[in-house]
């Protein structure tokens, strides 16, 4: 019976994701408020998708751009108040781990955060058969992540940090620091 109910819910959410305009945004916002772990004032734009929404907590006012993708199937996601992400953001804790985003965080378009990575150390076995490893991601308060950035598992980004567009962040970022590049390196400290 649960399979049928889940299938019906998937159909409803797919249809809702394509409903245009302000009415569509209102309907999606009301629908997902019921589905999330912690309902809050979240504006959901078209084509957004939420996998395992009961493990996704929005703690305050939030604005999500079109095609936002949040997956907590196996992990969890917690997002602080006054959060904004632009179009096509991919926030993924699907294999395990937790993504914690503090308050007053801005995320540009096409940003990817993923708590998991493929195992690949055993050269006698295909990579796609070696499973995954995972770790948490933590984003501090008042952080700006520019467009097309990738935040890898195990990373902590400190309060007031700025991640330059296109950066791949594979290690921690200190408070009030600008980083950029592949892999991301410190550009300067903010005062």
Please annotate each region the language model reported.
Residues 1-41, 104, 111, 117-123, ...:
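Terminal amphipathic alpha-helical/low-complexity segments used for targeting or macromolecular assembly
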Residues 97, 167, 175-177, 185:
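Glycine-centered loop/turn positions within well-structured domains
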Residues 48-58, 64-153, 182, 190-191:
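Flexible, glycine/small-residue-enriched loop-and-beta-strand segment within the central core
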Residues 44:
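Short Cys/His-rich Zn2+-coordinating modules
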Residues 148-161, 167-171:
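Beta-rich strand-turn-strand
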Residues 76, 157-160, 175-177:
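Short amphipathic alpha-helical leader/targeting segments
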